[in-house]
Amino acid sequence: MSLFGTNTGFGSGGTGVFGSTTTDSHNPMKDVEVTSPPDDSISCLAFSPPTMPGNFLIGGSWANDVRCWEVQDNGQTVPKAQQMHTGPVLDVCWSDDGSKVFTASCDKTAKMWDLNSNQAIQIAQHEGPIRTIHWIKAPNYSCIMTGSWDKTLKFWDTRSPNPMMSLQMPERCYCADVVYPMAVVATAERGLIVYQLENQPSEFRRIESPLKHQHRCVAIFKDKQSKPTGFALGSIEGRVAIHYINPPNPAKDNFTFKCHRSNGTNTATPQDIYAVNAISFHPVHGTLATVGSDGRFSFWDKDARTKLKTSEQLDQPITACCFNHNGNIFAYASSYDWSKGHEYYNPQKKNYIFLRNAAEELKPRNKK
């Protein structure tokens, strides 16, 4: 029996509709609270692809679980199912047809979760925790790409226990993104590698990092023809780099900007600087969202090089974000990211996932 259309909720929790009136410090933007969030820090979020009717949200957490919610048209969320790993879940993704979800964990395995049967099977194995997982749909092949702290990038046919290909990286994989035919992987020690995926995956170029501090997140952006043309890279130093792969004028087209900083404005009063935890591009407008350890999200227009909006400050960091397939819903997760160490961890604090109506706020600035 399909899970879609049945309510197999896993507990109770608060929810609402767009425009609810709560004013708690955990939800200063008055956004919709997703029902039954995970019991530990939320590491990743992913919305279902456009091939699926409706909107389904997947979230992975440090409680070793992956959860699925249906997001109804009125903003209500219905818990559908969950699966477990034996270690924290670090990344999730969907197959292009929406029938499968893929999960990557610190337990050194990746799993394929069939949502119709609610069965999950192991499809990948590394010698270290798996940090990233992406579905690749090429004209001549489809596979899963996993990036690990064992310094390898592996490509898996889900029907085979052995990888189709294994590529060595100079360092541990910290973040990655895929928009066919491009993949970008950022590693420890500020490594940055672009891969081309046509015919078969291969290393295309190593790039000197435009950022001076540890890489935290990366997201590929597209041109007006929907072809991947560059990426945004976020670091722990409250900064994002916009980098084109083949820009007409590299010195002019590539740039960095500061974000997720507060207080001080000059050298006499230093700024508080926070990590950029996630970056997500709007699927229609090409604008982007960043979320940070400062507990804020911001929306940006990279082409106009301007900020569109910054949220009020939540009472804990924002650890993950994503847009649904048509860009109408922005999901973001609020939970502790351990950026201030164990002494700032409060086990009494709940974790939250919020949904925001993003149809208007992400529209690019009008060109004058």
UniProtKB/Swiss-Prot annotation:
Signal peptide: none annotated. One of its GO terms (biological process) is transcription-dependent tethering of RNA polymerase II gene DNA at nuclear periphery. InterPro entries: G-protein_beta_WD-40_rep, WD40/YVTN_repeat-like_dom_sf, WD40_repeat_CS, WD40_repeat_dom_sf, WD40_rpt. Residues 15-37 are annotated as: Disordered. GO terms for molecular function: RNA binding; ubiquitin binding. The keyword Cytoplasm applies. WD repeats lie at residues 37-79, 84-114, 125-157, 168-206, 215-255, 271-301, 310-346. It comes from the Eukaryota. Belongs to the WD repeat rae1 family. This is mRNA export factor. It comes from Danio rerio (Zebrafish). The gene is rae1.
